[in-house]
From Swiss-Prot:
Lineage: Bacteria, Pseudomonadati, Pseudomonadota, Gammaproteobacteria, Enterobacterales
Gene3D superfamilies per the UniProt record, alphabetical: 3.30.1370.30, 3.30.1490.10
Subunit structure comment from the entry: Part of the 30S ribosomal subunit. Contacts proteins S5 and S12.
Organism: Blochmanniella pennsylvanica (strain BPEN)
GO MF assignments: rRNA binding; structural constituent of ribosome
Family: Belongs to the universal ribosomal protein uS8 family.
Role summary: One of the primary rRNA binding proteins, it binds directly to 16S rRNA central domain where it helps coordinate assembly of the platform of the 30S subunit.
PROSITE patterns: RIBOSOMAL_S8
GO biological-process terms attached to the record: translation
Descriptive protein name: Small ribosomal subunit protein uS8
Keywords: Ribonucleoprotein, Ribosomal protein, RNA-binding, rRNA-binding
Amino acid sequence: MSMQDSIADMLTTIRNGQISKKEKVCTPSSAMKVAIVHVLVEEGFIQKYNIKDSIKPTLEVFLKYYQKRKPVIDIIKRISRPGLRIYKKRKELPQVMSGMGIIIISTSKGVITDNRARQLNVGGEIICYVS
């Protein structure tokens, strides 16, 4: 695991957990990761999440599947990364799969989806997209 980009590590853990059909995955917790997972819960891509407080806080993500254990998340990909930050204005925000997916954006209003950013008329750093 690379500790350079902990958000990419979390997204990879979620992707690998869904491929191997796990019920839940665990990752070290941070405020940004909790905000991203909260957006995924609101949009229905994962069931729920818990923060286990111990010596090192751990984020438990409970994955969601359709019938016959087909993962709800088809694609989850990191866009902006530490070596190349990607910022977009509201009018430049792309759509994922013609609106079938979401883009998670870090804005001055918090971590929100692309649709919410358009409503609030804000742009920001494109963290990842999910479909």
